[in-house]
């Protein structure tokens, strides 16, 4: 059995979990998330805990049980507390601003980039060089942050580009004559 799957997922009082066959729905103050659990994983709900165990005789059942436990734990944390990702824009003239549900980025191209945020993700710009993303869905917020970063990755000579707030960009030395 997976080491991750051995630990049960504790459910806070403010979170409601509904298990319907292999479909697990988690409801909290930040919204509602649902996910289909793999057939090789058996889920049991006891009071305020969810336990995950692999079904016997199925290949990869151990790995799937650990994965399912980690995904459901992220869902419970997301609907209860939510997730945030911070991005920084480094470079002369690099700016970000919100216009409704659209994030407008000026990243040194000849045109501004309009990035439409998907449902479930909100963004705010405390300054022109900072973007703060908030969502209950950990996978979705990570994908949106990666998409925004992909427009202009940090380059290794000057460090210009879009980076995560906690990202350390390894700098190269310029060519010497």
Curated annotation (Swiss-Prot):
One of its GO terms (biological process) is cytoplasmic translation. GO terms for cellular component: cytosolic large ribosomal subunit. One of its GO terms (molecular function) is structural constituent of ribosome. Pfam families: Ribosomal_L6. Keywords: Ribonucleoprotein, Ribosomal protein, RNA-binding, rRNA-binding. It comes from the Bacteria. HAMAP family: Ribosomal_uL6_B. Part of the 50S ribosomal subunit. Belongs to the universal ribosomal protein uL6 family. This protein binds to the 23S rRNA, and is important in its secondary structure. It is located near the subunit interface in the base of the L7/L12 stalk, and near the tRNA binding site of the peptidyltransferase center. This is Large ribosomal subunit protein uL6. It comes from Histophilus somni (strain 129Pt) (Haemophilus somnus). The gene is rplF.
């Amino acid at each position: 059995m997976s080491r991750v799957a051995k630990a049960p997922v504790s459910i806070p009082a403010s979170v409601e979990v509904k298990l319907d066959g292999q479909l697990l729905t988690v409801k909290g103050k930040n919204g509602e998330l649902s996910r289909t659990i793999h057939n090789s994983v058996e889920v049991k709900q006891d009071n305020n805990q969810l336990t995950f165990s692999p079904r016997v005789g199925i290949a990869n059942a151990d790995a799937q049980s650990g994965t399912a436990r980690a995904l459901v734990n992220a869902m419970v944390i997301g609907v209860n507390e939510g997730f945030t990702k911070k991005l920084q824009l480094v470079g002369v003239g690099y700016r970000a601003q919100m216009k409704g549900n659209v994030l407008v980025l000026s990243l040194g191209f000849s045109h501004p980039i309009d990035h439409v945020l998907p449902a479930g993700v909100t963004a705010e710009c405390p300054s022109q060089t900072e973007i703060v993303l908030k969502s209950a869905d950990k996978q979705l917020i990570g994908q949106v942050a990666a998409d925004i970063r992909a427009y202009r990755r940090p380059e290794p000579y000057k460090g210009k580009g879009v980076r995560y707030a906690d990202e350390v960009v390894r700098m190269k030395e310029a060519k010497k004559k």
